[in-house]
């Protein structure tokens, strides 16, 4: 287990590769099964999960336009097994907490 640091107050850690989206205190977990070699599948899955979990907060269209680059980066970092990364989430005039990506290398 890796503990949160002051710079990552809302971080979480799992024993398997996963992505944790924290949007205005609403946490959406994306399982490793969502990941694939096709970015579109990953982006669509994240969009669907976020739109279904937080209706009215972020729509699929907003997610598509706002997170296209971030999702692409996350996908690449998953493949590279990067430890973590974060980015700001902007929804209109508001900025939510960050999106955190964590991977755990098998022992």
Curated annotation (Swiss-Prot):
Q: Can you tell which superkingdom this protein's organism belongs to?
A: Eukaryota
Quote additional remarks.
Answer: Partially overlaps KTR3.
Q: What's the name of the protein? A: Putative uncharacterized protein YBR206W
The source organism is Saccharomyces cerevisiae (strain ATCC 204508 / S288c) (Baker's yeast)
């Amino acid at each position: 287990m890796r503990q949160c640091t002051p710079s990552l107050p809302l971080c979480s850690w799992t024993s398997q590769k996963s992505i944790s989206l924290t949007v205005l205190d609403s946490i959406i977990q994306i399982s490793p099964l969502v990941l694939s070699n096709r970015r579109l599948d990953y982006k669509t899955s994240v969009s669907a999960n976020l739109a279904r979990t937080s209706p009215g907060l972020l729509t699929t269209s907003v997610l598509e336009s706002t997170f296209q680059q971030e999702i692409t980066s996350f996908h690449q970092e998953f493949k590279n097994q990067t430890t973590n990364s974060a980015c700001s989430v902007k929804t209109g005039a508001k900025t939510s907490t960050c999106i955190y990506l964590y991977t755990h290398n098998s022992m």
